[in-house]
């Protein structure tokens, strides 16, 4: 009997403390855009307004929603897709045991109950990409939805997509996804990588990682599974994912040829693209820029080729002494992508894997090819973002952003960090967040998170949380630096709460309220400590903010400006010091 993945097998939590799910009505009937509303307490009887923030958690944090993973989540985009009249349902390819990396399907594999659904594709001669609509002056429902989430006009969204400066990854077979946008003129986004390996994890664990990552703020998910049950794992994830899902198709294609890179063929890869497009994958990482002539350049590197996809294609090219088939068949790939509106994430297969290799000839040679491929994709109205490094010291980061914008004509940049030093295994979420904040400020549109397990092992759900929060910090810091119009609102609210000793509001306004409260309560667990005018760092007598309050009260009582109060107060304290014998410690 086939098994199933149930909500009882994974940890699902309600909304974060002090928050509730709210919906903003869109311009069309039934369109409801989710937000998270953070309540605030009053200040001496004066109300503090609630703060609304971007929400990626999907229906899982809506108390009215009953989680039934075997049914998938709601499909708000389904009617929008059908009413445009340019898609058709068809039988689709047959799902085979080889898709899951086995010769015979296992009776113990939890098959998703609706795997026999009919996929959609563009009608003959039609193009269903958001870029195609945008270039034809059409503002889609997805664009209207995104405009509300970002606080901008729908026409601005349409223009950014039409010009290639932003992508709206939204496969027509992933109607569960809540539309979002990736572009440097919008909020900086964060991607979380999940996926099994040949030695670790189960389908239930990966579904849990997905719900966990989106709860903490992941804007997209990449399923990088390389073990068994790749197809089935992906089906469970997509049917329950409220955010876009990306993959690296070469991983599954390699499994289909028993892990032997030289046995890969265009036919196997093409079949894999169609398989994943029919499932609803929203963007593909495709390493079409790893050209045969670039591979010898990497021989003098400290760490060679560190990209899994890049090394697979390099091995194939060298064995056959032929050009990369992803490059030679790129136009055919575009034809597949535009039938389903799958976006390109052009892979940086030659990214530097060490500080010593940053900004070298191999890296920038590949970038030139990615610029060439971007033009080809845009000719087909297929959406494109560009993947970037990697390991780059701080003084070389800006050059990466400038070259990408120039060579790739402003297409969104999507970077892994970059890591700014190589000496901190176990802390690479920090070494990379430093670079991520910088490159986000310079213009990167999406940051791929790094967890503490980077270079060490497969991340678990706690590592996923740590990675997402760390990268939400970097992304928000970049938004602040870029002057995003709503970025300051939450900072200002938290600072006000901190100064007024509204401890619960401080916790609730933070990116990780549970962690903030946990750390506070380690030393001051009593409920009364939630209203105290100090914390355990300084205690009641040395709290700088309490002293600042005293100065303000002194000024108010003596009808003085704050500056005058400080000067007068200092004179009085100086006199008191002298009168008590000028002893430093009483």
Curated annotation (Swiss-Prot):
The keyword ATP-binding is assigned to this record: no
Residue spans crossing the bilayer: none
Protein purpose: Catalyzes the synthesis of the hydroxymethylpyrimidine phosphate (HMP-P) moiety of thiamine from aminoimidazole ribotide (AIR) in a radical S-adenosyl-L-methionine (SAM)-dependent reaction.
Sequence ranges of Basic and acidic residues compositional bias: 22-39
Organism whose genome encodes this protein: Bacillus cereus (strain AH187)
Coiled coil: none
Gene Ontology BP, a term: thiamine biosynthetic process
EC number of the protein: 4.1.99.17
The name this protein goes by in its record: Phosphomethylpyrimidine synthase
Residue numbers binding substrate: 193, 222, 251, 287, 307-309, 348-351, 387, 414
Annotated spans, Disordered: 1-59
UniProt binding sites for [4Fe-4S] cluster: 535, 538, 543
Recorded metabolic or biological pathway in which this protein acts: Cofactor biosynthesis; thiamine diphosphate biosynthesis
Xref: Gene3D superfamilies: 6.10.250.620, Radical SAM ThiC family, central domain
Keywords noted in UniProt: 4Fe-4S, Iron, Iron-sulfur, Lyase, Metal-binding, S-adenosyl-L-methionine, Thiamine biosynthesis, Zinc
Gene that encodes it: thiC
Cofactor binding, note field: Binds 1 [4Fe-4S] cluster per subunit. The cluster is coordinated with 3 cysteines and an exchangeable S-adenosyl-L-methionine.
């Amino acid at each position: 009997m086939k098994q199933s993945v149930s909500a009882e097998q994974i940890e699902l939590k309600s909304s974060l403390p002090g928050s509730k799910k709210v919906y903003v009505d869109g311009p069309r009937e039934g369109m409801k855009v989710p937000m998270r509303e953070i309540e605030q307490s009053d200040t001496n009887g004066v109300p503090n307004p609630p703060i609304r923030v971007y929400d990626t958690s999907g229906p899982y944090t809506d108390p009215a929603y009953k989680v039934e993973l075997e049914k998938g989540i709601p499909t708000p985009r389904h009617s929008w897709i059908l009413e445009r009249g340019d898609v058709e349902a068809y039988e689709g390819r047959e799902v085979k045991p080889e898709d899951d990396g086995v010769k015979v399907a296992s009776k113990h594999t939890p098959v998703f109950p609706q795997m026999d659904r009919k996929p959609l594709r563009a009608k003959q001669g039609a193009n269903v990409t958001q870029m195609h609509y945008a270039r034809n002056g059409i503002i889609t429902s997805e664009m209207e939805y995104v405009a509300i989430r970002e606080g901008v006009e729908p026409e601005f969204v349409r223009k950014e997509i039409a010009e290639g400066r932003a992508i709206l990854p939204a496969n027509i077979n992933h109607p569960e996804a809540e539309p979002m946008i990736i572009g440097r003129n919008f909020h900086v986004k964060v991607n979380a990588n999940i996926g099994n390996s040949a030695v670790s994890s189960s389908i239930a664990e990966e579904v849990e990682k997905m719900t966990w990552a989106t709860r903490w703020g992941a804007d997209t998910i990449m399923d990088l599974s390389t073990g068994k049950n790749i197809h089935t794992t992906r089906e469970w994830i997509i049917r329950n994912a409220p955010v876009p899902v990306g993959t690296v198709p070469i991983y599954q294609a390699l499994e289909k040829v028993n892990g032997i890179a030289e046995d890969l063929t265009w036919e196997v890869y093409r079949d894999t693209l169609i398989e994943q497009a029919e499932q609803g994958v929203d963007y593909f990482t495709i390493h079409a820029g790893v050209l045969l002539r670039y591979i010898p350049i990497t021989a003098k590197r400290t760490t060679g080729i560190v990209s899994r996809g890049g090394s697979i294609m390099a091995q194939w090219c060298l064995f056959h002494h032929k050009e990369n088939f992803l490059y030679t068949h790129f136009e055919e790939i575009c034809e597949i992508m535009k039938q389903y509106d799958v976006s390109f994430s052009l892979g940086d297969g030659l990214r530097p894997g060490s500080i010593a290799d940053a900004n070298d000839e191999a890296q920038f040679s590949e970038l030139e090819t990615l610029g060439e491929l971007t033009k080809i994709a845009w000719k087909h109205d297929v959406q494109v973002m560009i993947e970037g490094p990697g390991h780059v010291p701080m003084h070389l980061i800006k050059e990466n952003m400038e070259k990408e914008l120039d060579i790739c004509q402003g297409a969104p940049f999507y970077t892994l960090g970059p890591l700014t030093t190589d000496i901190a295994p176990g802390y690479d979420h920090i070494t990379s967040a430093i670079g991520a904040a910088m490159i986000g400020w310079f213009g990167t549109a999406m940051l791929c998170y790094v967890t503490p397990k980077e270079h060490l092992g497969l991340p678990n759900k706690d590592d996923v949380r740590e990675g997402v929060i760390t990268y939400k910090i970097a992304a928000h810091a970049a938004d602040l630096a870029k002057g995003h119009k709503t970025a300051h609102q939450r900072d200002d609210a938290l600072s006000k709460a901190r100064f007024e000793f509204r401890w619960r509001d401080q916790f609730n306004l933070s990116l990780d309220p549970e962690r903030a409260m946990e750390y506070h309560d380690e030393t001051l667990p009593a409920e009364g400590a939630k209203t105290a005018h100090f914390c355990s760092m300084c205690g009641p007598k040395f709290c700088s903010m309490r002293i600042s309050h005293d100065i303000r009260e002194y000024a108010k009582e003596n009808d003085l400006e704050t500056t005058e109060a400080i000067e007068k107060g200092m004179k009085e304290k100086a006199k008191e010091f002298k009168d008590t014998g000028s002893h430093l410690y009483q």
